């Protein structure tokens, strides 16, 4: 089926905000006014369409970015029909990965702010992510009906905290209980919404007397911002000529898409005021897929390639999310950047080097689905039947291969052991964890070789809590989780010369005889090394690998606390054998005994993992952050300004053992405004007090 809406009338947008700024309610109202939802779902009732996982409805926070779409002809029905694809994004810091991956496939974003709370910590994180992917944005100041609502304070905070350049295109008429509508600064008219029709009906009226001076002041600021779009407009403006409505909107649009300004609007989604005008602003100011730079990638020989948002180009798309659906199995959400694809077509995944047949194509309206036959450049849809694709993979035309830039996902920072409450659930738990890890690239699962336990790792304590919860709800597996754990290692500081291991059993019948002499020495950063220095055949050739094997067996459990041994060099220097009683097993035992003894003599020490920690914090909390890192045995390595203003970055090296509970602590230290990332750096010697505690705990 040919494209129904021309691509210049597409808008792919994300609605992004801090928790409780009213983002989900705003999306619900959009779906209502665009005629999709006839009864508005309120988050208070746990009935919102976009929040479709059970935990989201219980907790009232959005965890997975559901993708949905709607059609819009303008508030007054005066626009040609536009197609708006909306990705709802979470606002909690442990789900930053979800925001990051949706930013990657958006063309524009609508930032929702609470008129009372204003620019919150999470808003700063989301803003940085939008900057990273150069996403043009508009701002919607929501909850104007709340006590303490202040539109102009949010405008100041956007300048000061986010270093943004907000340009109000509306100002509120009244606030708190008296919030009635907005002044449209382009038309210089007030808009008031009718309560009885849930805001569907509205009218333009003259600006109330008491607001005229304020409206004129902000209108002039807006026109000045528009005039800076190009020389011709600036000359016209400076020459005292009035700019037309079309010129103002066109100029603001160009500057928004260039990332120079952020048009600001206001309203109350809950009270059904202002959402339709915000939709008009999405059409007026945010880009269509052809207004943004073409997507970059590279070919199979690493040559740079690009694809334009055009149906005639070869098909290319990015898989940005995987979800498991109870009815159809795995859904892969993808964004089409160029070309078209039909259900039943074969697509190529250059990352996995596999061809796959595209089964059904579904378009989602929250969690209801409509099956469609084809998708085109600019579309967002979900595919059924792709077995190999994972988040961040490219899908493309098999004859025109392109690999789009991959998404980067942070390494998990916290691990916990998890075991099923009943033994019978072991297999089910394995399946559930693998399915969850496929959906969420920031969640990892592995089996600990030392303890045999299943270890899960993720981005924070809430992240793991929600995944364990999902395992219970979606897969029916009840699990218990252990305390967060640290992976220590053991090594040595000194050389132990000529240490012998003798394994002799000679009491009737076939005996055992193995005798090996080794020298053990530190081998920093090089792992385990075995050197054969046997001369004159004192140990026969065929038994030497057995000595090495015996030592390797012992490496897994050190002498201090049973942790793996790293960075040691063993030289096999001497030994003896018996013609009849010597065999592989005897030399394996001799090697193991010699190594254990040598370890004890070589001054063994405990190593702990050190993490590179980066904290982004507003300047006023920097002292607290540095003091706290020092109290965690951290070494601060330097600080720098965040580019574009907005605080400082502190670089430090901190032992992993001291970082548990850090996200909660950091939130309270900085009133939730600082964020951090950490990744493994290297192993370092643990201080004596730490070693003693770990060893005695292990021996107990």
UniProtKB/Swiss-Prot annotation:
It comes from the Bacteria. The keyword Nucleotide-binding applies. Residues 8-290 form the tr-type G domain. It is found in: Cytoplasm. Its main location: cytoplasm. SMART domains: EFG_C (SM00838), EFG_IV (SM00889). GTP binds at residues 17-24, 88-92, 142-145. Belongs to the TRAFAC class translation factor GTPase superfamily. Classic translation factor GTPase family. EF-G/EF-2 subfamily. HAMAP family: EF_G_EF_2_B (MF_00054_B). This is Elongation factor G 2. It comes from Ralstonia nicotianae (strain ATCC BAA-1114 / GMI1000).
